[in-house]
Amino acid sequence: MLRVAVPNKGALSEPATEILAEAGYRRRTDSKDLTVIDPVNNVEFFFLRPKDIAIYVGSGELDFGITGRDLVCDSGAQVRERLALGFGSSSFRYAAPAGRNWTTADLAGMRIATAYPNLVRKDLATKGIEATVIRLDGAVEISVQLGVADAIADVVGSGRTLSQHDLVAFGEPLCDSEAVLIERAGTDGQDQTEARDQLVARVQGVVFGQQYLMLDYDCPRSALKKATAITPGLESPTIAPLADPDWVAIRALVPRRDVNGIMDELAAIGAKAILASDIRFCRF
C-alpha cells in the first residue's frame, strides 16, 4: 500500500486535498482525521504538518508527500521533486526596514529572524556572509519592531504583510516556491513502481487540466499555416475538413493563462467560432 503525506492545515491543505480527490482518491470526511485509507486504490493518506512532510518522505517512512518547495529546501531531506502542482506560489526573500536601498551584503553582522534557518544559513554561506540566524516559528515580521532582529527572511506573496510592518524585500529570492509532489530520492527500481507511476500520472493529469484549455475554431484554409503556428498543441493540432472546402476545423490544447491573447491572434487572421473549453484531466 502506498503511503502519502498531505498537509493537514494551512494554505496548501485544501488545494492538495482537492487535487487528490479529482485524481480519484478518497478524501477525509473529518478535518481532525490524521489518516485515511483508500482500499480501492490501495493508498493510505497521512495528514501532517507541511513542515514535517519532507522529513517523513526522506526517511523512507512515506512514499510521497505534498508540501512547499521552500519547506523541502529548508528540511535538507533526501527527496526529489516529481511534480510542480501549480498552487501556493511564493518567493522566499530577505526583508529589512524600509527607507534604505538594501543589498544582501548589508546582512553581514546582522541578526536575521526566520522560520527557515537551514535555508538561510546555506544561502549566507554561499554568499560568504556571516550573520546570526534566529529561528522563530511564525510572525517573523514583528521581530524587527520588537528589537529581536535587524532583518528577516520569509515567504513573500503579495508583500502586503511586509508593508504593514514597514519592511521591504530585497535581493534575489532564496527560493521560488510552490506546492510540489515529492518522493524519497533513490526510489528507482523499488517495489510498487507501477502504483507509484499511476499516482504521479493521475495527479499530473489533474494539474494539467487546471493549466490548459481546449481551443476549437474554424479557420480559412489560406491561414492554416499561421493558425497552427499560433496553436501548435502538445504534439500537433487536430485539423478536420469542413463542408466548405476553403475552411478547416482546428482543435488544440493551449495554456489557460495565454488563452485570451491566443484568441485575439486567431481572430486577427480570420478564424471564426473560437471556443475555449475546460478540461478536467489529461494523460500524455
Swiss-Prot record:
**Primary location:** cytoplasm
Q: Describe how its activity is regulated.
A: Feedback inhibited by histidine. Also inhibited by AMP.
Q: Which Pfam families does the record cross-reference, listed alphabetically?
A: HisG (PF01634), HisG_C (PF08029)
Q: What family does this belong to?
A: Belongs to the ATP phosphoribosyltransferase family. Long subfamily.
> Assembly and partners?
Equilibrium between an active dimeric form, an inactive hexameric form and higher aggregates. Interconversion between the various forms is largely reversible and is influenced by the natural substrates and inhibitors of the enzyme.
Any idea what job this protein has? Catalyzes the condensation of ATP and 5-phosphoribose 1-diphosphate to form N'-(5'-phosphoribosyl)-ATP (PR-ATP). Has a crucial role in the pathway because the rate of histidine biosynthesis seems to be controlled primarily by regulation of HisG enzymatic activity.
The name of this protein is: ATP phosphoribosyltransferase
The organism named in the record is Mycobacterium tuberculosis (strain ATCC 25618 / H37Rv)
Q: What high-level taxonomic lineage is stated for the organism?
A: Bacteria, Bacillati, Actinomycetota, Actinomycetes, Mycobacteriales
